Each structure stands twice: as structure tokens, then as C-alpha cells.
Amino acid sequence: MDLSIIIVNWKSKEYLRNCLASILAETKELNYEIVVIDSASFDGAGEMLAREFPQVQFIQSQENLGFSKANNVAFQASTGEVLLFLNPDTELVGPAINQLYTTLRELPNAGIVGARLLNTDGSLQTSCVQAFPTILNQLLNAEALRRLTPGARLWGMRALFALGQKPEPVEMISGACMMMRREVFERTGQFSLDYFMYAEDTDLCFKSRQLGLVNYYVGGAVIVHHGGGSSQQARSNFANVMVFESNSRFLKKWRGASYSFGYRIAMSGAALVRVVTLILLSPVLLVLKGVGRWRSACSKWLAIFRWGIGLWRWVR
């Protein structure tokens, strides 16, 4: 088997249907299998697959395994020499999988390769490649600033704006679309179970580079990542905080407890500044953004502040 495409589903049945349809329509001349695991969302994906995509191997988990463990379980059921971990809320634009596969085969030093991700409206999803998190780049991390200084090494986004179609070395590939050789995935120790959600892709890309391999961005392989499926359907404070918690765990694992503690302090300080700013500018923001969005922003940054000072804890 040339390729195993592994997809973790969680309340994303409609996205999954479109994702699979695009794979079948655009992926030619490859001997591939598709393995879908539902992480206890029980959204009817299994019935839909049996009815519309009987060639897809389906695994129904009775518990929510989280992204890492669910992918690892599906991996055990796969047989391909190459693996593609793909989000259910993605759709191929042309033969993206073939292009990634060809690139991986042509580059013996490649660890993980990833595609150019677009938002639903066709705009570039700048998070498809990033630098590994540091206190500085996370403290300054704002979409407006990233767009003003896209070539700054701080963000690790230069590859997105490179001329031509040749693969570009990058630090980190988005977990929405990650392709690698099976033996590389095994050598990294698979997805780390240190994270329930978020930073799993960061950790895997870091381990790939630790092996002396190079992660590549393939700009000619284009995939739409709707970003509205799975956990982002309703971005709760839990999900918002888990981004920071997972980054903290990554930094503790690879840069030490002191650095991770510094990250928490910096992020809690930044969150407090945001909360105070939202309150001080509330007369203007309530008019411009509305009560609902203002309250949501206040709630988000207050939760992150509480996390940073140790008043919010999630134990796994």
C-alpha cells in the first residue's frame, strides 16, 4: 500500500463527506486506503460512511481519545508506507495529495511535508506554517502584526511568500495536513500523549527535526481548510485555554520548567492587559463589535489570565 490517509472525526460528518469526495475525485494513480476514526462523537459518521463510502475503513471509539491518541489508534490499523494525517474539515484543490506524495518521495531528507492551506473564502491561512513557540513570538502573536511583518523570522512564515513552487524548509507544519513516511512516524514515537488537543503537531514536527530531518512546505499542493469543524465549531473557553496549556506543556518538555513558567507569567500578563483594555474601551467596542462579541472576548482573556496564575487547571 502506497499511502494511508488517516482522519479523526469529531462532530464533523458533513465536512467529512466533502473531504472524502474531494480525495476520491482528485487523487489518482496511487494505491491508497482511508482510515477514519470517530472519537466518541457518535454523529452518524459511521452510518454515512457505510452508505456512501463503503471502501473507507471506520473505527468507532467509545471514548473521546483526543487528537493524538485517536491518530495513533488509526495508525495501528493502517498499512501504507506513507501516512497522511488530514483534518475532516479539509477539501483538496486539485491533486494536492499526489503533489505531496511526489515531493516526499523526491526528498530523502524530508521529515514532514505540508500543503498550502486556504480559508473557506480562498484567502491564505497563514497558520499552515509557523515557527516553534517561544515566549516572544507568542507574546506578540496577533494576526494583524503577523500580516504587517509576514517575512519576520519570528513567525516562521517566509516560505508562504517564496516565489516559485519548489518545496521550502520550515519549522512547523499544521496538523490539518501532515504527510510523512511510516518509518519516520514510528521513529518519532508517534503523536505524543502529553497533549489532549493542540500542540501535537508542534511536538511531532520538533521530533522530526530532532532526527535530523527537514520539514517542507509544498506551496503547489493546495487544500481548503474550513476551520469550522471539530473543536472550532463553538470555540469555548476550554478550547481557548487548551491552546495555551498545550504550548506550556510543549515548552516544559523541550525547554524546561523555568522557561514554561516564564511563558505562563508572560501570557497571564498579556491576558490581563487585554481584559483591562476591553473594559476601558467598552463604550467604543460595544458599538463596533456588539455586546456578544465583546463579552466573548472578555470571557476568553479572563479565562486565560486565570489559567496563567494557576486558578484554572485541567488534569489529564
Which residues fall in each region the model found?
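N-proximal low-complexity "stem/linker" segments adjacent to membrane-targeting elements
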Residues: M1-A25
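A conserved acidic beta->alpha catalytic loop
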Residues: S22, L30, D38-E47, E63
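Glycine-rich, basic loop-to-helix element that forms the pyrophosphate-binding segment
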Residues: S61-S78, Q99
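Short aromatic/hydrophobic "clamp" motif used to bind/position activated sugar donors
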Residues: L83
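Conserved donor NDP-sugar-binding/catalytic core segment of glycosyltransferases
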Residues: E91-C128
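Short, flexible, basic/aromatic active-site loop/helix in glycosyltransferases
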Residues: F132-V170
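A short, conserved alpha-helix in the catalytic core of glycosyltransferases
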Residues: G164-Q165, E171-V222
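Active-site-adjacent helix/loop segment of glycosyltransferases
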Residues: F206, Q210-V287
